[in-house]
Amino acid sequence: MFVAGKSIPKIGEIRFGYASDDESRLITHKYVGVHPYLVVSNNTYNKTSGQCEVIPFTTKRIGKYNPVHIEYKAGEVRGLIKDSTLIIEGRDTLRNCQLSEPVGEFTEGNWERVVEAMKVQCPFLRKESTDSTVLTIA
């Protein structure tokens, strides 16, 4: 049974979340049901908007190599008790009430792999530019 958390999610936390498929008549690629999620939105957004951006983990074997799927062994990340894959292209927005209390958190070393995969998924994050409309992550 899923129990919603009362604390405001913080970036880097791993929380279980419940996502329902509101468009149940359509075939979607959203991860529905209860899954562990990595919180990736900033703390100010999480606090003021009542929602946060998350990336789902799955324990299913994905098969072929994909640069935006990051595999973690059980225990490699505090809070993951099974081998898991972080699915970068599954990034979604959930309401804070759809997330449990934190079950783990990412370290600096874990973030490096996520940032590199995000650059592959969103190539505009790699561009060096003086244009203020382009976001640069170095």
Which stretches of residues belong to each language-model region?
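C-terminal terminal-subdomain/extension
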Residues: S7, Y72-A138
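Loop/turn positions that initiate beta-strands
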Residues: P9-I14
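Short, surface-exposed secondary-structure edge patches
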Residues: F2-I8
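Compact nucleic-acid interaction/catalytic patches
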Residues: L26-E76
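A broad, low-specificity signal marking well-ordered, structured residues that form hydrophobic/aromatic
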Residues: R15, C52, I70, T85-L86
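Short, charged beta-turn/beta-strand-edge "cap" motif at the junction between a beta-strand
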Residues: S20-R25
